[in-house]
C-alpha cells in the first residue's frame, strides 16, 4: 500500500542542476527515513557505494520491478521534460557525489566531465554490471562515455540495454 511513485531525493543533472527523477516505488513508504534512522543499514549503504544487497526496505513487488528495470520507466517523463536523455551517465544523488568524492578524491575530474552532460535512462554503467561496480569505477566509465559519445555508441549501448534488462543483470 502507498503511492505508486517513489519519494526519492533530488538528483544532480547537467551543469549540477537538481531535478526530481521519476521512478515507480519499489521500497516501503518512508524508505529514506528508515535508512537515516538505522545506523547499521546506513553504514552498509555508504560502504557499498550507496547500494544495499538484499535491502530490507525493498518490497516483494519491488524486487521484481527492480530486477527488470520496470521502476525506471517513468524516467521517460524526465526525458520529455529535457532533464535526461535516453543514453548518458547515471543520475547521482547530491549527497552521494559529495561523500564519494571525499572517499575517492581522484574522481573529482570525472564528476566535472559527467556533469557537462544530461544523465541517461541507460548508459555504460547500466549495461556493464550496474550495482556490482563501485563509485570510482562508475564515474570513470561515465566520464569516458561523455568524452566519446556518438550516435553509434548510443545505439550500441541501447542494444546492450535490452539483454541487461531482460536478464536483470547487476540489479539490486
Feature roles, as predicted:
Residues 1-172:
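Conserved small/aromatic sequence motifs within transmembrane helices
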Amino acid at each position: 500500500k502507498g503511492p505508486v511513485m517513489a519519494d526519492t531525493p533530488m538528483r544532480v543533472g547537467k551543469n549540477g542542476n537538481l531535478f526530481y527523477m521519476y521512478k515507480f516505488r519499489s521500497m516501503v513508504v518512508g524508505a529514506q527515513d528508515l535508512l537515516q534512522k538505522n545506523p547499521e543499514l546506513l553504514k552498509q549503504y555508504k560502504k557499498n557505494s550507496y547500494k544495499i544487497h538484499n535491502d530490507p526496505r525493498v518490497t516483494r513487488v519491488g524486487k521484481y520491478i527492480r530486477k527488470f528495470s520496470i521502476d525506471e520507466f517513468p524516467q521517460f517523463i524526465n526525458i520529455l521534460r529535457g532533464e535526461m536523455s535516453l543514453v548518458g551517465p547515471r543520475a547521482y544523488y547530491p549527497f552521494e557525489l559529495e561523500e564519494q568524492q571525499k572517499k575517492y578524491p581522484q574522481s573529482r575530474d570525472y564528476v566535472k566531465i559527467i556533469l557537462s552532460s544530461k544523465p541517461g535512462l541507460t548508459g555504460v554503467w547500466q549495461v556493464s554490471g550496474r550495482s556490482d561496480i563501485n563509485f570510482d569505477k562508475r564515474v570513470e566509465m561515465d566520464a569516458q562515455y561523455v568524452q566519446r559519445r556518438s550516435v553509434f555508441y548510443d545505439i550500441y549501448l541501447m542494444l546492450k540495454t535490452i539483454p541487461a534488462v531482460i536478464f536483470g543483470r547487476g540489479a539490486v
